[in-house]
Amino acid sequence: MAKILVIDDDPDFVNATRMVLEKEGHTIIRAANGNQGFQMAKQEMPDLVILDVMMDSVLDGLSTSRKMSEDASTANTPIIMATSIASTSFAEYFPTDEYLHVRAFLSKPVRPADLVRQVKRFLPKEK
């Protein structure tokens, strides 16, 4: 079905995401930080990216989403941002959607049904 790039430094999250989405027939590729993820997105041309906010630096995911939106080869790739930041006091300082280049947010821990629903929502329709 689809090739999905998961950019996250938490191997448990990546493995859980892989298990859920491979059951749906998707191929999962992984990057452990924003720079690696950006390079993989340019090389692999995934159908969708699931991106963590905080990895190497506090806002690594935000800078990665910005770089992807500014690069012609990745600008149209839908991004779902997965974060545990929504349940912290840091959330009030988080940029609003108008400053982000993402299609949706998922709060960690992510429920499998929510993950599947959001992925289906943003994948290109099958021909």
What is the predicted function of each stretch?
Residues 15-23:
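Charged docking surfaces used in two-component/phosphorelay signaling
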Residues 45-47, 73-79:
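His-Asp phosphorelay/catalytic-motif detector in bacterial-type signaling
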